[in-house]
Amino acid sequence: MLITVYCVRRDLSEVTFSLEVDGDFELENFRALCELESGIPASETLIVYAERPLTNNQRSLASYGLKDGDVVILRQRETPEARPAAPFPGLDFSTIAVPGSSSQPAPSQPQAPPPPPPDTSSFPQGLDNPALLREMLLANPHELSLLKERNPPLAEALLSGDLEKFTKVLLEQQQERARREQERIRLYSADPFDLEAQAKIEEDIRQQNIEENMTIAMEEAPESFGQVVMLYINCKVNGYPVKAFVDSGAQMTIMSQACAERCHIMRLVDRRWAGIAKGVGTQKIIGRVHLAQVQIEGDFLPCSFSILEEQPMDMLLGLDMLKRHQCSIDLEKNVLVIGTTGTRTSFLPEGELPECARLAYGPGREEVRPEEIADRELAEVLQKSAEEADQQKP
């Protein structure tokens, strides 16, 4: 039978693993297997099943009622030598109020002792001294970068320079973690036939698997968390330069109204083809330009456009255009190959992309709207045309 073991160590670190054992397997041997998996000495383990500690090492697991698919809790016992005999160097414990220390613990209250161990076990790590912890993090760039990545709220409080704010956020997170830990232990100790408790345990295990999967991905494939720039090429429409987005997932080639006005092809728009373009969102189609000339490198290719009223990018080369001219996207050489002519054109680096397509455009650039970008580009084209006209004058 398969037994899932939820292990909580003395330092509050946790691990979950499964063991395949027989029903007549003795508890003593089961402890030994758990020691191999968790690293906790068998003499320090406390195994709990259905809110009942398993103490007789000579009894079999089946005699305790364990069956296939059950979950047991393994906790590391507190030992006298595990508790610090003297204050941790540099830390003052005299001002720390441990819950329940104001009065003598009564023997008839077995539930009172569990809360103090999590607090006292965390003291040696310096978490009881926010000022010291703050100095340690600021002095370690590697740990600080990890904190920014994995705990942005605490990193923000740390870099704010406000010790009181940092202390507040740190204590709130510690209290929340302790609350979740107590809730998790309560769930794993609940009645195994309680459907609600089992559903919460399943969700907790699922979240642990997600976190583990993300941690492995960050270590083994960190590049998967990066962003890539989209594929753009330089081209000309009606003689005017345009940066076109190559999108093999789009059904049709489209152009923004602002770009069509810059290229002076709005006069060719057939408004009988007006409609709604649906994809990730919806856009209003003003009409269609049935035939226009697109220049890619030295090739002049016929193309049709659907004109969209509000579109952040100037032009999008869709599958209709790509299949018509047998284009292929060569990511190894970073080029677009025109199959009918063999012409190759390179995809643009990020520095040459339109502002709306750069990775920097987004969270920190909301103040720049697509229509403002279009107006700016239109002004640049008009200025360039005026300069060329002045140069051609005798």
Curated annotation (Swiss-Prot):
Keywords: Aspartyl protease, Chromosome, Cytoplasm, Hydrolase, Protease
Protein encoded by which gene: ddi2
Name of the protein: Protein DDI1 homolog 2
One Gene Ontology molecular-function label: identical protein binding
Compartments it resides in: Cytoplasm, Cytosol; Chromosome
The Ubiquitin-like domain, residue ranges: 1-81
Superkingdom of source: Eukaryota
Record text on subunit structure and interactions: Homodimer.
Feature: compositional bias, Pro residues: 107-119
Source taxonomy: Eukaryota, Metazoa, Chordata, Craniata, Vertebrata
